[in-house]
Every structure is written in structure tokens, then in C-alpha cells.
Amino acid sequence: MRQRTSEDVQSAVRTFSLSTLITASRAFLAFSLFFLIVKDEYSIALSIFLLGVASDFLDGHIARKRGEDSSLGGFFDHSCDALFVTTGFLALAISGSETYFLIGLIPISFIEYSWDFITNRTPLTPTFIGRFNGISYYVLIGIWLGVKALDAEISFEFENVLVFCARFLCFTTLFSIFVGIQNRIAVKF
């Protein structure tokens, strides 16, 4: 049996840290967000969404400030982000918004991005396009929810802009996946 090291103990302590609990709350908020959107409770869903955004902002800040940041914590944070935005887009698609094409791409992109961490425990290395996509997923869901929560009559043109943005995100997500795969292949050869 392997001896426990101080690194094992520190890792276990970080597992149950405040920042990790804040990150985990986003996973629970994702399911609430999903059901509220599907039930057309957009005002409450927007509030839950904003809590999720706040948790995403706070968890990393708190982890760094308290010395709780780790590769595993970063992976967990990105996992919760992917779950949160994927369930948000899934719920919006079920409620009639044209976001269905992102539902499969976001998890694929997350797996591609996380592959080296999962297989080799190498640190996650975000790219510009990956950051752009991650932020844009949140922004697009927020705009869609804001419009629905306000029960605003949106013009056909504005709806087309939202659909265009979602399709553009589909393109940039595919681009990010292919760049990640290409970089991984280039490193091996």
C-alpha cells in the first residue's frame, strides 16, 4: 500500500475548499437553470444564470487568493463551465431557440481541450479562441435569457442576429477543436 504524502493531504484539503464548493455549486445551478428554462420561468432562470456567472468569476479568484488553485481545480472549473453552458443551450433549444447545434459541440470541445490533462495530467492550456468561445457561450445565453425574462418583443432581425451569433460560435468551436487536434499532432511528430 502506498504511503500518503503531504501532497496527497494538501490535495485532499483543496478538494473540499471554499473555491471548490463554489465551483461545484455551478453544477447544481446548471440543473436548476435547465428546468427553469424548460418551464418558461425565465426571470428566475436569469437569476440562477447570474449566480452561475458570479460563481465562475469568484471561484478562481478565491482559489488563487487562498492558495487553493491546482490543475485538478482548473479541470473541475472547466468541467462545471461546460456542463453549465451545455445545459443552458439544451434548455434554450427545447424551448424553441436555435441553439441545438452547440449542444454536442461544447462537450466535444471540452474533451479535446482537456485530453492532455485527462491522459497525461499536464496542465490545461487555454488558447485565445478557447477563451473567446467560453466567454461567448455565457454572453449568448445571458442575452437570450434576458430577452425572454423581459418578455421583450424582439424583432425578426434581432432574433436572426442571435441565431447568427450561435452559428458563428459553432464555427469558432469547430475551429478550436481542429486547432487543438492539429497542435497535439504537431507535438507528436
What are these regions (language model features)?
Residues 20-75, 88-91, 98-107, 156-175:
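Membrane-embedded alpha-helical segments that form the functional core of polytopic membrane enzymes
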Residues 1-16, 78-189:
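A feature for the membrane-embedded catalytic helix bundles of lipid/isoprenoid biosynthetic enzymes
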